[in-house]
Amino acid sequence: MKKNTSPILTGTAFLPDGTGCASPTSHYTFLPSEKVIVEKVRFRNRFRIEVVGDLYIPKNIDRSRKHAAIIVGHPFGGVKEQTSGLHAQKLAERGYVTLAFDASHYGESGGEPRFVASPDINTEDFSAAVDFLSLRD
């Protein structure tokens, strides 16, 4: 009988950025846009939980004026590097300022225990996001 000598590969694959390391955006499920600037932002909700988000700003926007913004949330169990970030980026490419954030207890945001869905806290996260954006210069 012939023995199978094919190697078995296990582990996690990643796409290198040319330096042999994973790129800083490798945890996103979509490619970054050349038309958009992304800023990491942090703010607290009224439960004092730190909420972490990505603010998507069109590169050609007039920063001397205030602009309307769209807040994009993720489904329960998701994070900002997935669908909500993609939607936020696509809207920013069309000229809107957008914010995609990790809900409390998920992703980079705080909150214990982890991976708990609370409609009350989730609603407060959106309220805190509105407050954060309205107070921003």
State what each model feature region is.
Residues G77-Q89, A103:
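The serine-hydrolase catalytic nucleophile loop
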Residues H67, H74-V79:
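Active-site glycine-rich loops that stabilize anionic/oxyanionic intermediates
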Residues T83, V116-D137:
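Alpha/beta-hydrolase active-site loop
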Residues V72-P75, A100:
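Structural cue for short, hydrophobic secondary-structure segments
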Residues G18-A68:
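N-terminal cap/lid segment of alpha/beta-hydrolase-fold proteins
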Residues K90-G110:
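Conserved alpha/beta-hydrolase
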Residues N4-P7, T12:
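Positively charged N-terminal leader segments that act as targeting/secretion signals
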Residues Q82, H105-A117:
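Glycine-rich "HGGG/HGxG" loop immediately N-terminal to the catalytic nucleophile
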